[in-house]
Amino acid sequence: MTSIAQKIPRYILGMSDQPDELKVPGQVRDAQNVLPDVTLGLLKRPGTKYISDLTTTALGKWFHIHKNNPFTGSERYIGQITRQGQVLIWNLNTGLAQNVTYSNVAISPDELDEYDDSGNTATLQDYFIHEQDNQLQVLTVNDYTFVTNRSTSPSMSEEVVTARPYEAFVELRAIAQHQPYILDFEEIASDDDGNVTKTSTITGLSVSFDGWNGYIHSDDEDSCARAGTFVEEDDDFGSGTGADWYSQVSCQAISPKDPTAATADTASQYSVSVTLTDGGSGYEVGDSVVKTDYGGVTGNNYKFTVTSVGYTTTKTSLGQVSYDSSTSNSETIIDAIVTDINDNITGVTAEAIGNGIYITSSAPFTVSSPDPTLMVIVSATDDGDYTTTDGAGGTTTRTNIVSGVNNVSQLPYQCKHGYIVRVRNSFELEDDYYVKFQGNFGQDGDGVWEECAKPGIKNLVNSDSMPHAIIRLAETVEDDDGNNVANFLVAPLKWAARRAGDELTNPRPHFLPAPGNTFGRPIQNMLFFRDRLVFLSDEYISMSRTGDYFNIFGKSALTIAGDDPINAAVSSTVPALLHDGLVVGAGLLVVSPNQQFLLRTDNDVLSPATVKITNIGGYSFNEKTKPLSLGTNVGFFSDSGLYSRFYEMVDITVDRDPEVIEQSKAAGTLLPQDLELVADSKENDLIMACERNSNEVWCYKYFNTGEKRVLSAWFRWTLIGNVIHHAIIKDSYYAALNEGDQVRLVRADLRPLREATTITEDNFRIHFDYYGSVADEDLTYNETDNETTFTMPIPVFADESLQAFSLGTEAGRIGDITVDGTTGTLVGDWTDSDIVVGYNFNMRVEFPKIYPVAKSGLSGTIQSDTRGSLVVSRINVTLGDSGYYEAKLTSLGRDDRTITFESITAGQYEANSVPILNEAIRSIPIYDKNTNFTLELSSNHPSPTTLYSMEWEGNYTNKYYRSV
């Protein structure tokens, strides 16, 4: 046998579920409570600092807020929305509760100042009431934290733009002496409420075979016996009367579908059509009648169905006014016509406005003139129906009467303030729009025409059904202890009303109900992209106007502007219910449970005309999580199968599909299926995920140099308490932990040797969980009992190892703490300096079996020699900053051995400093076959432990076989 040695230069590649012989050198079986670093090696994870107790209720939606305030710097908060809809917010750094007030009144950004000093107007927010944690989704943009309830369907407000009265306007356009100015008035029939009475008439009638399918075999009856023309006159059926039509039954002799030998092989194939000659009155769509035995042939039956109806109105003359001008004074002409109307036309009132006449009535009417060159008339037209309140708590339907002109040139220069006109332009509805006259200073006469929304329709969004906001107000107050306390306002948002067009020319976004419906599609999530708010609902993506976040309607019905709202839909052959998204360089990545899409534009400006959506992936997505930014790439979890997977989407561009890599392949069956809570940090190249109410956090550490990934490691942390929310903000990891029906806030600083988290003056961190400090003046020494007592600054967990660490002249002194109630006791005198108290946690690394490895051929892949015989003599472990740690050797057929490595001995470090070795090589004797033992390295001590590398020595033979 040959004596050989081999070195694994680093152990930062994390856990692998592969067989040991396939593991890449540097991977391990288990890596618990570690933190890989490409520079510093495999570190013991940082301890967690106890911040404060938060609440006794863990249920609800938890979230965090991070914003940069130019006056106070980085502001960090954690919040909870209870199941009942109450909002609680704490400062992440201090744990102090912040002031939260409520408003039931929808607000806009311009109105925030009115609420700075407001008190509570409510104790709960109904929109926030929820049953499932993922029912509420949160998005923070500057001072606004938007909250979306996935179970609430958006709706329109019952408030409508007030319909105009029955009115008309006559503008004098020419003065012609000795020519009559004639106006004819007609009243349109209406009911007692003033609604236009409309009579329906059939405009579409269909016919079908009834009780047979148009095919008759010659065995059953004579060929084409049912053909003919059949007339129906003055027929009453359904809800109408007096319809006339005739039907034409045609026949063709064909070869039978079921020939028999008994008779001649012939059959009759019939077709039928209907021609409407009189639509009658009173019919409704769907009315039908069956006519039987046409032509005296039994079974020759047909069903006639009304498919469409039209409506007519009845007019009655109210009279005529006429003025034969013998003057060239327009004022005289107008005054004379106004006087004639008021004196002779019953129920109609007229007034002179500038160069025209404003006419109104309590009942619908029309006005016309035989000579349009003298006067231009803007008269009322029927513009459909609208729904309004009836004054008794209900609703009623009204006729929407709106004046109309064919083109903008017919609009008068002077008019009634507030007068609304529909400009038709052509026979197409798509180019119609509405304008409103705005008189100077709100007065009749001179003014301008401005585009407006169609009156009588729902143009206002119901704020109570839309996402609400938790708003960080500008004012900050101080509590009795001098701590800054922020003010937050919980309120619905005031969404801008539709200011132009109607349901066709300026439609609602997809998440709002279609016209005639009550409820829309629930908003699944909100995003922020290209200075727009983004709403995901079913397969639809809707965006606000650019920079005007609470405006979801277009600016004009005349043209599409670049900053108008965007409404688009993804296209897929499988259900694509969108759940979340992430901004990437190429656009906006949106994800559904089974597919990924890219919303983008090929133009510099994202607009309704330039938006494009492409399908770029078909991978399963865990909808309880969110897509994550990995620098230029995107990562996301999948929960298909028994275990979770983590995919990375690489090179997302507009001209080709991205490459998707499963980064969790090495972890195999390690990741739990129900991962739900995800925290990530691009600065620290770290992703942390866990199940809700679990104390185990799965971590993925990555690092790239150029296009090469040099670090891709999975490892796990175990914490005291179950995680209900966690987040990484800059270099700090925050976790809300539930233990014993108490939610507590802790923080771990991820950056090694960061001054803010360095507890000893030697730049070594103390690795306690839930650590807290006690000042020397708060320590009491009892000389008789030789005990030091103090009030515990942290929670007490009976099952955990509680210790103290001295920071004074005896730096590094460690003692066990006994607790009685809230009083902690240490043996000896500890009053010379401050102390840190906390709970030990165990760092554990389980090494894989050792095999001789070599690079294979030109491919350079690592290949393990599992056929040869290897007896390992010893293992030399190289460590960095390390104090107390243990090596546990489990051997087949032998007792387990635990080798303890103490801190450096006296004489090897400076007095009154922490006895921690900066670098050391420790030998672990093995003397066993490589497949017969397992080695673990652990540290359950407040001192650091850093693993650099491992080198094994042993005797090896290839058993005289050569690999080929």
Name each region found by the language model.
Residues K198-Y323, T339:
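Conserved, function-critical positions that sit in or immediately flank catalytic
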